[in-house]
Amino acid sequence: MRIKHLLLLSILLLVFAVSCDGQAMVEGEDSLCVASWNVQNLFNAVLDGSEYDEYKPSAGWSQSAYESRLSNASKVLGYLPSATSYIVVLNEIENPNVVEDLIKIGDISKIGFHFYACAGMDGGAIQTAVVSSIPIKGARIHSVSDDQRPILEVEFDTSYGKLFILAVHFKSNIGGQSETAVKRVESASVVRQISRQIQKENPGCLVLVCGDMNEECWDENSMGRFEYSDCPLKVSDTFLRDSWYCFWLDQNLGLWPGGSYMYNEEWKCYDNILVSQAGKDGTGWEYNSCGIVFEGIIKTADQRPFSWDRSLLRGVSDHLPVWVTFFPSV
């Protein structure tokens, strides 16, 4: 079925939902795992015209290469911690057809991804998707500017209260970190506006901002530390009113490895899941744990992400999935 969506400015955006057969990974106590992963340019072998040149059949991109990438992606998603329900944000996925192919793969079909929503700019090569084992109540797409990826808002009505996912993919640093910083601030400002409206209309709801933000939470640009920041998204290592809990700031966790993306031999904490104060308010879904998927086929022998290499047709992704888990309050 088609999910209700909001269309702003002249950007044509798409959102879909699909039902398919499947069941939850584990049974017993209710639990929720929310994850975010930039899959690094996951394209099928069908020519749509908007692909990057290297993913066109004329460049040698094939169905077998596509299926290999699907298989690897599904294996990595299978490394997520066991839960009774799952919501996963995927960046850099081509279109809804690729989402459908991915969630039907054997390694993750047992998770029970019944629903999904996608958003992207008209003519853009990649989209952001939210896949879920929980029914999607509604989805809206919020434009940022003509040359920026939209914000995908997805609403869930669970047994433990309302949950909203704001799926993002902020502007990359291509062109210079400082030169592109204003674009990430623009996106973060839209996220702030959306989240405030959501919380005003749904007091006590849980809101999560998930995706590749292309900068770190202490960079004092789109995000900044709650105590003294004027940034659009104020973050903290604990759950405070009018701020977002950011696990990258929580030094008590000792997360390994030290980031989700490696650039110039340095770990970067670009992929994020920001949790609203409702994640620790004693009601509904309560934050439990967090982590980074760094095992199996996504980890190289020298402790790096096994990046996808189009020329060699090998690898998985240059980003690692990050995740948080929740349990219902007792």
What are these regions (language model features)?
Residues V39, I93-K171:
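Structured beta-strand-rich core segments of catalytic domains in phosphoester-bond hydrolases
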